[in-house]
A protein has these predicted regions:
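Solvent-exposed alpha-helical segments and adjacent loops
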Residues: 29-178
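Secreted/extracellular small peptides and ectodomain modules produced from precursors
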Residues: 21, 108, 342-343
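Bacterial N-terminal signal peptides
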Residues: 10-18
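Bacterial N-terminal signal peptides that target proteins for export
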Residues: 1-10
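Asp-box/BNR beta-propeller blade signature and adjacent active/binding-site loops
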Residues: 177-548
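Sec-dependent signal peptide cleavage junction
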Residues: 17-33
Length: 548
């Protein structure tokens, strides 16, 4: 009995130890935190807007860039005589005919907010659905930023797991484009305005710079504008545009008997030029003779070496006679490769052309080159004018100008890679318009920033819609993400009305922060009774691309 009892105890002990050993080595299954999407297809509704189709194409491109997964795109069409096969692995964008899309749509309908979207994952489907095209676009961007951009490169996965479901409400009032770039208005302020809304006066043609070459003063904003014959007001902001104060008034003391009247343009020297150090502020403008027939006009330069507090007149770039024979609308730009400062402007003085676009350049701010043409039309009645130029990252300069003499004074852009070579002067480039034909005319401005996409963002603004008619809406703002090959239109961030007695929208201005992420947009909407005068308004817009 003793031996049998001992053997029984030994067997029991072995069994218990084996049980403990089994408990110790048993492991729970690892929960998957990523989803392999390499075998998925992106599926969209058979009837889809062009905008969403383009957005899905960009979505596919970014998925490849972030995850390494190159997916096909197809529509949800199927032969109605056959049973719909829902067994495939699919990313469903929008309200497709798949069962899980319908289920997700019902969940989304339960939310009252129209700015909502849903992302839902089942065994073989990922649903990305918004209540409208705008929220679907935001849902796709949210998916990319939060679930695709966060994985290991070339992993062909996203940071999602089966069973995931979330509904989000968009809280931003930003504009989102098909390439997922967003424009968000972050500030509106008044730069300067009349003392009374019953006033009659001129508040137009604003330009602005953000100081970048003035040491501790960098970031300061300086602005100027047309304000009659009283001189060019210099407005200053040290809080990035929230508040403004006048610090100077610039007058012409070089040309005896001339008044400072029209078209001021501010520029900060990026390098030393002649006797003038990097950071010197230049104001270029048109002065005119006081005589009743305005018989002489000049392109005159003024400089400030103390951040705009005081000024002196240094030279005339050009001089010509009369309202019908004058020189107007100067624009300054420095070309690093040639170390030249260029002054582009409109010239009425050639009897062979009603008006043409010309330029001179200098390397010392004392002597200027001979006058050269960049646009001089074969039709002598045409009047190209109001130049602005933006340098883009592809090495091209884009020059925007109006073409008075064609109905509506439409805006054109001509390009070059060399400021001293614009090709045939009779070639005036391409019109600025969307694929739908949306365009504008008169008083253009263009500028470019690296923010917003692979090719950066080119922005063009003008005064009035084309075809032109008295309207309660000013011109749209046109945006290009491909160096000016194509454009999309958005509502003007500074709304204004256009009537025959209104000067609103003449002339808008675009500039950027040093890193390009902030757009400073200035214009002159109506202020007085019956549009007797305007005021200068600033809007700051934050530009955010997928990789910004």
């Amino acid at each position: 009995m003793t031996f049998k009892r001992a053997l029984a105890f030994m067997l029991l002990a072995v069994t218990v130890l084996a049980s403990f050993a089994a408990c110790k080595t048993e492991e729970k299954p690892v929960e998957e935190t990523t989803l392999d999407i390499s075998g998925y297809t992106i599926v969209k509704p058979d009837i889809t807007s062009n905008d969403i189709t383009e957005t899905i194409s960009n979505f596919k491109k970014y998925l490849l860039s972030y995850t390494g997964a190159e997916l096909k795109v197809s529509s949800d069409w199927y032969n109605p005589t056959q049973t719909l096969d829902e067994s495939g692995y699919e990313i469903l964008v929008g309200n497709t005919n798949r069962t899980v899309s319908a289920d997700a749509a019902k969940e989304l309908e339960a939310t009252e907010d129209e700015n909502s979207f849903i992302i839902k994952v089942t065994d073989n489907k990922i649903v990305i659905l918004g209540k409208n095209d705008d929220t679907t676009r935001r849902a796709l961007k949210y998916f990319l930023v939060n679930y695709a951009k966060t994985v290991e490169e070339n992993s062909k996965t996203v940071n999602l797991k089966k069973g995931h479901s979330e509904i989000k409400t968009v809280t931003s009032d930003s504009i989102i484009f098909n390439n997922f770039t967003e424009f968000e208005t972050i500030l509106r302020s008044t730069v300067t305005a009349p003392e009374s809304k019953w006033a009659i006066g001129t508040y137009e043609y604003p330009t602005m710079i953000q100081l970048r070459h003035n040491g501790k003063h960098n970031g300061t904003l300086l602005s100027t504008l047309e304000s009659g014959d009283a001189g060019y007001r210099i407005m200053k902001s040290t809080d990035d545009g929230v508040t403004w104060k006048q610090i100077a008034s610039v007058k012409d003391y070089l040309n005896n008997g001339y008044v400072t009247t029209w078209m001021p343009f501010l520029y900060e020297l990026p390098v030393d030029i002649g006797d003038y150090k990097e950071g010197t502020i230049i104001l270029a403008a048109t002065s005119r003779n006081k005589s009743s027939d305005f018989d002489i006009s000049t392109i005159t330069l003024y400089v400030s070496t103390n951040q705009g507090r005081s000024w002196k007149t240094i030279c005339n770039v050009d001089k010509a006679g009369g309202l019908s024979w004058g020189v107007w609308e100067p624009f300054l730009i420095y070309e690093e490769s040639t170390e030249r400062l260029y002054c582009f402007y409109s010239d009425d003085s050639d009897p062979k052309h009603d008006q043409k676009l010309v330029y001179k350049y200098t390397t010392d701010l004392k002597t200027w080159s001979e006058l050269k043409e960049c646009v001089a039309c074969d039709d002598p009645a045409l009047r190209p004018g109001m130049i602005s130029i933006a340098k883009m990252s592809n090495g091209e300069y884009a020059m925007a100008f109006e073409m008075v003499g064609i109905s509506g004074a439409p805006i054109y852009i001509k390009k070059t890679k060399n400021l001293d070579d614009w090709g045939p002067v009779s070639d005036y480039g391409q019109p600025v318009k969307t694929a739908e034909g949306i365009t504008f005319g008169s008083a253009p401005w263009c500028n470019w920033t690296p923010a917003g996409g692979e090719c950066g963002t080119l922005i063009v603004v003008g005064k009035h819609p084309v075809p032109y008619a008295n309207t309660e809406e000013g011109a749209k703002m046109l945006i290009s993400f491909d160096y000016g090959k194509t454009y999309v239109a958005i509502d003007n961030p500074i709304p204004y009305a256009i009537y025959s007695d209104s000067r609103c929208g003449y002339s808008p201005h675009l500039s950027f922060s040093e890193d390009g992420s902030i757009l400073y947009y200035m214009n002159n909407p109506e202020y007085g009774v019956k549009y007797s005068c305007e005021y200068i308004e600033l809007v700051k817009i934050k530009i955010t691309g997928m990789d910004d």
